[in-house]
């Protein structure tokens, strides 16, 4: 007889018909809160409604219910993303010059928006070349579409409709997984299964399918486009997929099918999976065959990674075991207890994810220009500047968000009674040492970095250029950075024998790549000017970290307010009768951190914009002479504060200031309007609550006199609300001002 082990019981991991679908309930403002559902007494109600609508912690303390709401909201978010993407593709299909751009990307600018001629507004439609009049776009969509093999506006229509269908599907999924089949808490906490699906499914199969698309569709179509074939003559994507002979004409190894794969003769496939390095001289982008190879390799790694964790089969790693085994000689209990934190506090989990994703986004910003992935991206200076700026801002916001949710975790989810001598506890116990040392580093960096500039301004003002820190007087060369550049420039042949050129032209060693008489990329020299501004970067980043980290480490208690945890994540002051305890909540640290994040990112994008215009971007003559946009003035001008003001801000603002009456005039209006939005923020940041309450009561008196007083009592914004409105307008105004300044400048001169 055969003895079988008993079949493992399958766990039921969903609740059916968990919560009924009720439009009546959703139509009641504030239905998620007993207090808010009563309706407004004062105008504070509308602010609380916005503040608490998505604060699921405040609706219920049931972790399972909170998890389900977050999960469902994610589908709503995905739906909006698909809707947005669909809109972008629809604009490309309906309003753009994509097909014209595809036929001549060096002389025709990308445009996907035409302004209706209402009372002279058609002035905004500039000539982007090829007889098309519209607004020049700088989002990089045209370049992505070309890289993915889209050759007609009909294909864009089809994709737009597909994205709409997916948006509807996501909306349905969000409803279904909350109201019809809601996952149980155990499902959300099953981290090994989640890792397997995310690694092998999303990243592994996602990369594999993209590699497949690139090999079978993008590569052959781009090969034809690069050879100058008319897009209308190129076979359609399905023809390449269904007809192997068609591909074999371009890539001979296709004739052999899968035989080389199974006989391990993989080098046969080197005609479409390459390892070249550097840029394609035709398009100024990375070799698409390198990119396909990269995605195939990434897919293999993640497919393997997705099979490492123990699920139903009792084989593989358990995350709890990994964390608890992670102990160093000086770290006490090490990571013990972190597993429980990360499976019961979604704020802690989100905090880590935001920190990682924020850092990754900033890495993306730096790779988009140094290794431009799409065809004709590198010579589209407006798009290059926009992509760098966009990814820097997004990265900054995500990192501040990481600190915000770390602090919320500390206040709402941290249980000091169960934590002893693990890493988090040890960090909290020596927080004074951490913060005071970090503070010292900030003071040192601030005085020394600004001191170098002040010295240069003083020497310059006194007419003593020989005593300045510059490449031509007292040199402060960034020797470590230059060493790293040099190492990378020499790497091919030494560390990566298959590669013909280094990963990025910026390292040096190579020649410049120019497309259609414009510089795509060249080796970027670093000198004293970069050394100086680099230390400003170090200073602003350290101060941002100081503010955010102090907020997290002192979120629960401090010498000033030992019972801070009881006051919550955001509070104005420690009650009446305790002076000097305002602006100490964890929320206030996020508020202050946002301003320093804004400082830090502003210096970075200014550095990038000027450096690229001065030392990289420009035109090249038939004799091979490069003329940069600002003629290499960065090295000598940016070493004084006066130089930044005069030769960057003022000199380069001339395009936006003089844009009235031209197709760039919208940027001039935005520049003005965004300054107003920014200035408006100061009204909220500089005046106290009592001032406004007094004013309101005077206005209410006037309304009463005229018998037009509303039933809902007007109230001044609370201290926290006023700060939130202030910082929002400060950042919005500042970012929109920078956007208008950058784009008017680069579209005019680039």
Swiss-Prot record:
<keyword id="KW-0004">4Fe-4S</keyword>
<feature type="transmembrane region" description="Helical; Name=II">
    <location>
        <begin position="156"/>
        <end position="179"/>
    </location>
</feature>
<protein>
    <recommendedName>
        <fullName>Photosystem I P700 chlorophyll a apoprotein A1</fullName>
        <ecNumber>1.97.1.12</ecNumber>
    </recommendedName>
</protein>
<feature type="transmembrane region" description="Helical; Name=VII">
    <location>
        <begin position="433"/>
        <end position="455"/>
    </location>
</feature>
<comment type="similarity">
    <text>Belongs to the PsaA/PsaB family.</text>
</comment>
<keyword id="KW-0472">Membrane</keyword>
<keyword id="KW-0408">Iron</keyword>
<keyword id="KW-0560">Oxidoreductase</keyword>
<feature type="transmembrane region" description="Helical; Name=X">
    <location>
        <begin position="664"/>
        <end position="686"/>
    </location>
</feature>
<keyword id="KW-0602">Photosynthesis</keyword>
<comment type="function">
    <text>PsaA and PsaB bind P700, the primary electron donor of photosystem I (PSI), as well as the electron acceptors A0, A1 and FX. PSI is a plastocyanin-ferredoxin oxidoreductase, converting photonic excitation into a charge separation, which transfers an electron from the donor P700 chlorophyll pair to the spectroscopically characterized acceptors A0, A1, FX, FA and FB in turn. Oxidized P700 is reduced on the lumenal side of the thylakoid membrane by plastocyanin.</text>
</comment>
<keyword id="KW-0813">Transport</keyword>
<feature type="binding site">
    <location>
        <position position="691"/>
    </location>
    <ligand>
        <name>chlorophyll a</name>
    </ligand>
</feature>
<keyword id="KW-0479">Metal-binding</keyword>
<keyword id="KW-1133">Transmembrane helix</keyword>
<keyword id="KW-0812">Transmembrane</keyword>
<feature type="transmembrane region" description="Helical; Name=III">
    <location>
        <begin position="195"/>
        <end position="219"/>
    </location>
</feature>
<dbReference type="GO" id="GO:0009055">
    <property type="term" value="F:electron transfer activity"/>
</dbReference>
<keyword id="KW-0157">Chromophore</keyword>
<feature type="binding site">
    <location>
        <position position="692"/>
    </location>
    <ligand>
        <name>phylloquinone</name>
    </ligand>
</feature>
<keyword id="KW-0793">Thylakoid</keyword>
<dbReference type="GO" id="GO:0016491">
    <property type="term" value="F:oxidoreductase activity"/>
</dbReference>
<feature type="transmembrane region" description="Helical; Name=I">
    <location>
        <begin position="70"/>
        <end position="93"/>
    </location>
</feature>
<keyword id="KW-0249">Electron transport</keyword>
<feature type="transmembrane region" description="Helical; Name=XI">
    <location>
        <begin position="724"/>
        <end position="744"/>
    </location>
</feature>
<dbReference type="GO" id="GO:0015979">
    <property type="term" value="P:photosynthesis"/>
</dbReference>
<feature type="binding site" description="axial binding residue">
    <location>
        <position position="675"/>
    </location>
    <ligand>
        <name>chlorophyll a'</name>
    </ligand>
</feature>
<feature type="transmembrane region" description="Helical; Name=VI">
    <location>
        <begin position="385"/>
        <end position="411"/>
    </location>
</feature>
<feature type="binding site" description="axial binding residue">
    <location>
        <position position="683"/>
    </location>
    <ligand>
        <name>chlorophyll a</name>
    </ligand>
</feature>
<dbReference type="InterPro" id="IPR020586">
    <property type="entry name" value="PSI_PsaA/B_CS"/>
</dbReference>
<feature type="transmembrane region" description="Helical; Name=V">
    <location>
        <begin position="346"/>
        <end position="369"/>
    </location>
</feature>
<feature type="binding site">
    <location>
        <position position="582"/>
    </location>
    <ligand>
        <name>[4Fe-4S] cluster</name>
    </ligand>
</feature>
<keyword id="KW-0411">Iron-sulfur</keyword>
<keyword id="KW-0934">Plastid</keyword>
<dbReference type="InterPro" id="IPR036408">
    <property type="entry name" value="PSI_PsaA/B_sf"/>
</dbReference>
<keyword id="KW-0603">Photosystem I</keyword>
<feature type="binding site">
    <location>
        <position position="573"/>
    </location>
    <ligand>
        <name>[4Fe-4S] cluster</name>
    </ligand>
</feature>
<dbReference type="GO" id="GO:0009535">
    <property type="term" value="C:chloroplast thylakoid membrane"/>
</dbReference>
<dbReference type="GO" id="GO:0009522">
    <property type="term" value="C:photosystem I"/>
</dbReference>
<feature type="transmembrane region" description="Helical; Name=IX">
    <location>
        <begin position="589"/>
        <end position="610"/>
    </location>
</feature>
<feature type="transmembrane region" description="Helical; Name=IV">
    <location>
        <begin position="291"/>
        <end position="309"/>
    </location>
</feature>
<dbReference type="GO" id="GO:0000287">
    <property type="term" value="F:magnesium ion binding"/>
</dbReference>
């Amino acid at each position: 007889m055969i003895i079988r082990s008993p079949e493992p019981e399958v766990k039921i991991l969903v609740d059916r018909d968990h919560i009924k679908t009720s439009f009546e309930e959703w139509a009641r403002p504030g239905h998620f809160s007993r207090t808010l559902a009563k309706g407004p007494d004062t105008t504070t109600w509308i602010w609380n409604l916005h503040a608490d609508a998505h604060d699921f912690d405040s609706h219920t303390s049931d972790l399972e219910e909170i998890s389900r709401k977050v999960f469902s909201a994610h589908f709503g978010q995905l739906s909006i993303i698909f809707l947005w993407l669909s809109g972008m593709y629809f604009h490309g299909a309906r309003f753009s010059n994509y097909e014209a751009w595809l036929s001549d990307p060096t002389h025709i600018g990308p445009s996907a928006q035409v302004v209706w001629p209402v009372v002279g507004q058609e002035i905004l439609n500039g000539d982007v070349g090829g007889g098309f009049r519209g607004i020049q776009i700088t989002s990089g969509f045209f370049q992505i579409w070309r890289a993915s093999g889209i050759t007609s506006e009909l294909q864009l229509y089809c994709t737009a409709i597909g994205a709409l269908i997916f948006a509807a599907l996501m909306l349905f999924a969000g409803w279904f997984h909350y109201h019809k089949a809601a996952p149980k808490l155990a499902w959300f906490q099953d981290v090994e299964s989640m890792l397997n699906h995310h690694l092998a499914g999303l990243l592994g199969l996602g990369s594999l399918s993209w590699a497949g698309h690139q090999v079978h569709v993008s590569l052959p179509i781009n090969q034809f486009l690069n050879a100058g074939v008319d897009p209308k003559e190129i076979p359609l994507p399905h023809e390449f997929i269904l007809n192997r002979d068609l591909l074999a004409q371009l890539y001979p190894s296709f004739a052999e099918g899968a035989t080389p794969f199974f006989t391990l003769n993989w080098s046969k496939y080197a005609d479409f999976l390459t390892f070249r390095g550097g840029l394609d001289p035709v398009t100024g982008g990375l070799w698409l065959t390198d990119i396909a190879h990269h995605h195939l390799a990434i897919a293999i790694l993640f497919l393997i990674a997705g099979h490492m964790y123990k699920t139903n089969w009792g084989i593989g790693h358990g995350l709890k075991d990994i964390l608890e085994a992670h102990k160093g000689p000086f770290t006490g209990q090490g990571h013990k207890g972190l597993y429980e934190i990360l499976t019961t506090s979604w704020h802690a989990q989100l905090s880590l994810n935001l920190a990682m994703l924020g850092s990754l986004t900033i890495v993306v910003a730096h790779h988009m220009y140094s290794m431009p992935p799409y065809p004709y991206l590198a010579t589209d200076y407006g798009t290059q500047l926009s992509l760098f700026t966009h990814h820097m801002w997004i990265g900054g916001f995500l990192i501040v968000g990481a600190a915000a949710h770390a602090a919320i975790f500390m206040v709402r989810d941290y249980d000091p009674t169960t934590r002893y001598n693990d890493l988090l506890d040890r960090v909290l116990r020596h927080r004074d040492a951490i913060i005071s040392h970090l503070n010292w580093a900030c003071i040192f960096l601030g005085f020394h970095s600004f001191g170098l500039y002040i010295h240069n301004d003083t020497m310059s003002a006194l007419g003593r250029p020989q005593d300045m820190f510059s490449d031509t007087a007292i040199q402060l060369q960034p020797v470590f950075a230059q060493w790293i550049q040099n190492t990378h420039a020499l790497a091919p042949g030494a560390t990566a024998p298959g590669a013909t050129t280094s990963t990025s032209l910026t390292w040096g060693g190579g020649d410049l790549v120019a497309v259609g008489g414009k510089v795509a990329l060249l080796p970027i020299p670093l000198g004293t000017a970069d050394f100086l501004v680099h230390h400003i970067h170090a200073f602003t980043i350290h101060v941002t970290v100081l503010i955010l980290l102090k907020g997290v480490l002192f979120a629960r208690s401090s010498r000033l307010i030992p019972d801070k945890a009881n006051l919550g994540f955001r509070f104005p002051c420690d009650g009446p009768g305790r002076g000097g305890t305002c602006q100490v909540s964890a929320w206030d640290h996020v508020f202050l951190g946002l301003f320093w994040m804004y400082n830090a990112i502003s210096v970075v994008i200014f550095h990038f914009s000027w450096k690229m215009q001065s030392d990289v971007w420009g035109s090249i003559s038939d004799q091979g002479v490069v003329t940069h946009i600002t003629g290499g003035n960065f090295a000598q001008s940016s070493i004084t504060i006066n130089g930044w003001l005069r030769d960057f801000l003022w000199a380069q603002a001339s395009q936006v200031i003089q844009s009235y009456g031209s197709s760039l005039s919208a940027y001039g209006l935005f520049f003005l309007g965004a300054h107003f939005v920014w200035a408006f923020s100061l009204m909220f940041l500089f005046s106290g609550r009592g001032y406004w309450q007094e004013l309101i009561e005077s206005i209410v008196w006037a309304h009463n006199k005229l018998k037009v007083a509303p039933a809902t009592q007007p109230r001044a914004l609370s201290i926290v609300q006023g700060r939130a409105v202030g910082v929002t307008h400060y950042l919005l105004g500042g970012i929109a001002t920078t956007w208008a300044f950058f784009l008017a400048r680069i579209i005019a001169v680039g």
